[in-house]
Amino acid sequence: MDFKQITLSDVGTLRPYLRAQYRSCDYSVLGVFMWADRFGYEYKIEDGVLFMRERSRHGGEYDYLLPLGEGSLCDRVHALRETVGGRLTMSLVPEDALDELRKEFDFTAAEEPDIADYMYKAEDLAYLAGKKYSKKRNLIHQFEKLYPDYTLEAITAENAHRIAECCAHDWSDAGLSELAIYENDHTREVLEDFAAYGCTGYALLTDGEVAAFCIGEVMGDTLIVHIEKGKREYKGAFQMINCLFAKTELEKCGIRYVNREDDVGDEGLRQAKQSYFPEYMLKKFRLEYE
């Protein structure tokens, strides 16, 4: 089987491999399918192992992601090296995979800038306890005071189209970067085919209007938040949806961590993510095999 482009029709095939092997957003269903067009993701499956590659960001033809599926990680990488047949470059390798790989392989590892995932304790985001979260709690209290009749509604295949319409009308692409426009477009696509992805999400409503919404997925002990949108005219909406998402999934699934993805080198995003005091940064590396 040759490598083939990843499309929505492949969700059912790839989903079993993209579950709970790593906490990194890059090895999750939406992490792959939302960004497949952007990074040129391709895949093939052989002997129960999923191989994925992307257009190289470093001048070569392809970089390969960690293979997922049956057998040990090292066995899967041996199989990948046989598949590639020549010099192997891997990207988006989580830091916690390096020690195991070093047992059997010689490679150079370089941290990839601006793509480390922000990892938070789920209880911190759910309850915002302590002095360091006082500003967040104040904004939530303001939202509750201004909109006492707010409701939290689970996103389903039946109501996702209404959220998508809200995106189309209320989240303008004017003045946004190419990357932000791509994210907006693919957020709408996720909503339009919501059931296919098997993800979870919630909309924060005030008087029937969508003030904010979020979409993510639970992988093992971690909630990965892929999408979070809000209207700035609803003061405190971002803080409220962030808190409610973490609290709901903590109570429902017993998660330990929330992964709020990377900051892509954007200073505004970096400050916003740091303001929630991450427990640690999930670093990712590019590997060159000898």
Residue ranges and their predicted role:
Residues 14, 143, 273:
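A residue-level signal for conserved active-site and pocket-lining positions in enzyme catalytic cores
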Residues 22, 27-97, 205-232:
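Conserved donor-binding loop and adjoining core beta-sheet/short helix segment
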Residues 200-289:
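Aromatic (often tryptophan-rich) hydrophobic motifs at membrane interfaces
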Residues 1-19, 232, 285:
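Short, extreme N-terminal leader segments that mark the start of a protein/domain
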Residues 97-110, 138, 264-281:
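Conserved active-site alpha-helix within GNAT-family acetyltransferase domains
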Residues 77-82, 143, 242-250:
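A conserved short alpha-helix in the GNAT/GCN5 acetyltransferase fold that borders
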Residues 158-209:
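Short, conserved active-site entrance elements at the starts or edges of catalytic domains
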Residues 106-176:
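Acyltransferase donor/substrate-recognition loop-hinge adjacent to the catalytic core
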